C-alpha cells in the first residue's frame, strides 16, 4: 500500500553534516523524499511533538537534544513506507541496530540516534500535519 511517513533527521545528523548520507539510505530503499525542510524546534514544539513520552525518564533529555540544533523534517512516500522506514532506521538503541541501517551505521548512542520515524499510520498523519500545512502538501503537485 502506498503510504507517507514522517522522518526527522535529528540535530546530530545536521551537526555532523551527514544528512546526504542518511538521505541516500532512504532513497536506496525505494522511498521518495517528497518534501523536506530544515527548522529549529522551540521547546514548546518539541514538548508538544513528543508529549506521548512526557511521563518517561528520557523525556527531558530528549527535548533538550531536539532543541539543541536544527533538524530536517521530511515526508517520505512509498509502498509500506512506515514499516520500511522503521526497518532501515534500525533499532532505537544503536548498540542493537544492525549494520546497514541508519542507526547501526551512524548513530553515536541511544540519545543521539540520528532519526525519528512514524510508528503507525495514525501517527504518520498526525506528525506530518504537525510540521507541514495542507498548502505545502497540496502544492507538491503544482508547478
From Swiss-Prot:
The active site is at 116 (pros-phosphohistidine intermediate). GO terms for molecular function: ATP binding; metal ion binding; nucleoside diphosphate kinase activity. InterPro entries: NDK-like_dom, NDK-like_dom_sf, Nucleoside_diP_kinase, Nucleoside_diP_kinase_AS. Keywords: ATP-binding, Cytoplasm, Kinase, Magnesium, Metal-binding, Nucleotide metabolism, Nucleotide-binding, Phosphoprotein, Transferase. ATP binds at residues 10, 58, 86, 92, 103, 113. It catalyses: a 2'-deoxyribonucleoside 5'-diphosphate + ATP = a 2'-deoxyribonucleoside 5'-triphosphate + ADP; a ribonucleoside 5'-diphosphate + ATP = a ribonucleoside 5'-triphosphate + ADP. GO terms for cellular component: cytoplasm. This is Nucleoside diphosphate kinase. It comes from Ehrlichia ruminantium (strain Welgevonden). The lineage of its organism: Bacteria, Pseudomonadati, Pseudomonadota, Alphaproteobacteria, Rickettsiales.
Amino acid at each position: 500500500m502506498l503510504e507517507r511517513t514522517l522522518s526527522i533527521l535529528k540535530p546530530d545528523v545536521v551537526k555532523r553534516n551527514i544528512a546526504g548520507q542518511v538521505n541516500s539510505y532512504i532513497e536506496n530503499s525505494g522511498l521518495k523524499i517528497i518534501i523536506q525542510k530544515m527548522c529549529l524546534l522551540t521547546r514548546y514544539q518539541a514538548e508538544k511533538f513528543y508529549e506521548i513520552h512526557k511521563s518517561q525518564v528520557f523525556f527531558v533529555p530528549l527535548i533538550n537534544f531536539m532543541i539543541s540544533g536544527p533538524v530536517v523534517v521530511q515526508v517520505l512516500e512509498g509502498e509500506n513506507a512506515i514499516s520500511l522506514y522503521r526497518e532501515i532506521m534500525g533499532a532505537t538503541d544503536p548498540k542493537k541496530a544492525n549494520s546497514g541501517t541508519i542507526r547501526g551505521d551512524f548513530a553515536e548512542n541511544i540519545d543521539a540516534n540520528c532519526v525519528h520515524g512514524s510508528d503507525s499510520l495514525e501517527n504518520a498523519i498526525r506528525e506530518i500535519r504537525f510540521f507541514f500545512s495542507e498548502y505545502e502538501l497540496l502544492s507538491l503537485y503544482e508547478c
